[in-house]
Amino acid sequence: MTNCYSYKNIAESQNPLFKNVDLTIVLTMKDSVRFKKDPLLLNLSKKTIFQINKGYKACKKPDTIKRTVEDLTHAYYTAFEYSKKYNNVIILEDDAEVLNYEVSHYKKIDSYIGSNDFTIISMGSLGFFTKRDEMFYETHPMAHTQAQIISKKTRDDIQKLMLNKKFMGHVDAVYFSEQNVLVYHEPLIVQVLSETENFQNWEGAPLWAHRLTISIQGLRDDKMGWYKAYLICKSSAEIREYKLNILSLIVFLLFLYCKK
């Protein structure tokens, strides 16, 4: 299986944005040209490398890997194995694009991970948000994994889970969603969704429903749609946070009405 992957050093930095991240791994496919070598992406950590995947069709992998979904899960597993000697690691998928270039956001996250325990910090994910504080939202489940900071312990834990599940299932929904993911309050590094083979295998709803959802959110063909998508996620979080107060107010008003 090790023959299915190769590695290439693409950048080193003496002054990275994240002082508390040891390595950035960009997951890509052989002959892919999707990754945009944005200077910010190449300066996230001290070292940035490609993990180049030949793919399950061209290289023998475990028998359960029969779709791009499982192939991507296996690629994450392999990246975690490669990074065993490192502490905090950033994993980028090769369609990751920078949305927000304001350096202060990245510095805030770096300061946080330098003084706090964490599992996964996302720089661009969606889901059912719950506000944690002014800096982060929690989300369960989560969707989209194109830019994640993952602690060493969490990578080890997810590897075990991937082995137990034989690499079956989506990385975000099956493996990351159970890890108390923190999502930064602004989308920083995002992806533009297109009709890839992996998209064709999205689960949880019919394909037409996924297409409709990302169209409503504005995530197709324009990365600026992520601001709208975050607003939707944040608004739903506010509704859930205050729903008990709203319900109590309704009950109180009904009580007053019935007393008349």
Q: Model-found features: residue ranges?
A:
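An acidic/histidine-cluster motif and surrounding catalytic segment
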Residues: 2-92, 96-260
